[in-house]
Each structure stands twice: as C-alpha cells, then as structure tokens.
Amino acid sequence: MTEPTADSGFETRAVHAGQAFDPTTGAVIPPVHFSTTYAQDGIGGLREGYEYGRSGNPTRTALETQLAALEGGAHALSFASGLAAEDALLRAALTPGDEVLLGNDVYGGTYRLIARVLGAWGVSVRVVDMSDLDAVRAALEERPARIVWVETPSNPLLRITDVAGLARLGHDAGALVVVDNTFASPALQQPLALGADVVVHSTTKYLGGHSDVVGGALVLNDDALYGEVKFLQFAVGAVSGPLDAWLTTRGIKTLALRMQRHSENAQQVASFLSAHPAVARVYYPGLPTHPGHELAARQMSGFGGIVSVALDDAASARRFAESTRLFQLAESLGGVESLMNYPDEMTHASVRGTELAVPPEVVRLSVGIESAADLLADLDQGLARL
C-alpha cells in the first residue's frame, strides 16, 4: 500500500496514514506491538530506531503518523492523557516567570494544571475572552505572554475564536499560539492551517470516539520545539501504551463519518431545545443566533456534537441532568453514546469560585450518534419532569 499524501482526502488519510500492512504476514491491519524492548544488531545497532518502549513503539508511531497527517503537521506525539500532553508542552515552552494567556472558558483541568501545578514553579496565568480579539490585543499590550492558549469551540460554553486573527496577534507579541482542537477534531477544523503553532487533543474524546481509551496528543511543525517536547515525553514517561494507541488509531478511521452524524444530531437537539419553554438559553455554534455562528461557518466544516443549555436556575439544571435515560450522566464527551454533564460540580468543579466558573444553571450535552428522534424524545421527557 502507498502511504497517502497531503493531497489525499481527509477520509483517505484517516483510514490509511501510518497503516501499512504487515510486511511479514500481509495482515491488512498492523499488529499491536506489546514488546517493551527491542533486539539490537550489535551495541547501538537499532532497528528502525526502536530501543525501549518508553522512547518508541511501532504502534504509537503509527498513531502519531496518522495524527500528523490529519492535522497537516510535520510532527505528532501521543501521550497517556490529554493533560499529560499539555504538561509536556508547557514544560518545554515555559520557564519560571513566564505567563500563559488562557481563554476564560476552558476545561477546568487545563486551568488547574497551569495555575496550581506549574504555578508552584513560577508560571503565572491570566484569562481573557478569546472570542474578543480586542480584549486579547489589550491583554498582550498590557503584559507579554509566552503562550496564548485557546479552545475553540470552548468547553462548555462553545465560544468561537478567530484562530487566524488570534495567531496574528500572538505572533506579533512573540507568543506561541496553542489551540485545543478537541471539540472540533481535525475532521471539522484545521488550526495549523489557520496559523496556530501547536494543536492539542484529548484523544479520549472524538478521536478515540468510543469512551474506551484515555489519551492525548500534540501536533506541531517546529522541529526544535518538537525535539524538546519529545525529550520531556521520554524523560517523564507519559506515553500512550500500545493497546491505547491501537484503539485510538481504530477510532480515527471512522472519525469523519462520526463527526458528521454527531453534528447532524447536535443541530437537531439544539433546535429542539431552543424552542422549548423550559430552556433559557442554548449554546451551539450551529444556531444562527449564536454570536460566533458566521465565524464558525467560515473556519469549521461542521459545528460539532456538543450542545450546552441553560435552565432557569441551578436546581432545574441538576434535575434535568438526572432525569434523562438515553443521555447518561457522566464525565467526558465525544463517544458514540450521548452523555449529560453538570459542569459546575463535575468537569469544571476545580474552577468554581474563579473567573472561569461555569454558571450553575448550565448543563452540557455530548450528543451521540443514536437515532435523533430517540434523543429528542429523551430530552423532552427529561424537561417535562422539571
């Protein structure tokens, strides 16, 4: 099989990048390489560069090849979790006294990592509404930042940031521009092509896509930064295991199809909720009423599978989150099954009382690929119980 090129279609790259058949047996699906160590042809005589499982593994290499091909990057690194990927990048790019300019609507774990873990080593963090480029410009003029870090769409309020505009502002200020592309996935958005320096993923979510593997990834073009992050990955050991890498690779092969269905179902869910009298507000970039709708339509090829909704008050939100049947109350997102999350006490509990706190009346829906009619019926009965 010939490795797909950058000109190959996204779906072709998702299926074939890094997936050459096994040369020994002809197996169409590459095997999972569980070996922790590799025989050498004499001292230092490595075969294909493999020495020890922490420094490299063929199954992990296959996943990294696939990830780089999908994001259009020169390099990719696969980690044991999304936060492990973030930690390696931050440690490689920052020194004590540096500052991260962070979106004011990001995953609570990211803020916790920077503010509490790296904060103890002299790294500071400021937050700003990344959907307001004037506010970003003012923040960078007030004080320089080493990294500008954004999620778009953001978690959980689905704010949309102009990645190309943000990249220009960040680069003019000498900052590294990092985009967490977890919510959109490379099937819907290509941040590197828009000017970002690094793309971050929790591969646990849409890339894996089946709620059965935890992982993270970085995709980037800069050779020097790649070398620094790869060294830290090796030194710390936060690598994805062979089976985790293989499961993620398998999930990615259907990514384009899944994201299309997630987006279609989410659009129907958002429209239904917008018309429901018990709902105060719906956050979904696919709605024309969303402030970032036109921007999302320009820089994304679909609006994604996450819908957040505000009820009248926190008590109503809690009851709704506990009243659905198909939508399971659980952490995480991006699997084929629909999930319900109450951010204030679940995914974003670590930022309660801060400027990143999520309003307690908000519930986040990860809309799966089930029958849309069944999902709407489930939401309808849940809202009827308020």
Regions found by a protein language model. Name each.
Residues 281-363, 367:
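Conserved C-terminal alpha-helix-loop-beta "cap" of PLP-dependent enzymes
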Residues 2-6, 76-276:
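Conserved PLP-enzyme active-site core in the AAT-like
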Residues 19-21, 34-40, 183, 205, ...:
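Glycine-rich beta-alpha junction loops
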Residues 48, 74, 214, 248, ...:
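Short amphipathic alpha-helical segments
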Residues 2-57, 63-66:
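N-terminal "arm"/small-domain region of PLP-dependent enzymes with the aminotransferase-like
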Residues 115, 124, 138-141, 258, ...:
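PLP-dependent enzyme catalytic core of the Aspartate aminotransferase-like
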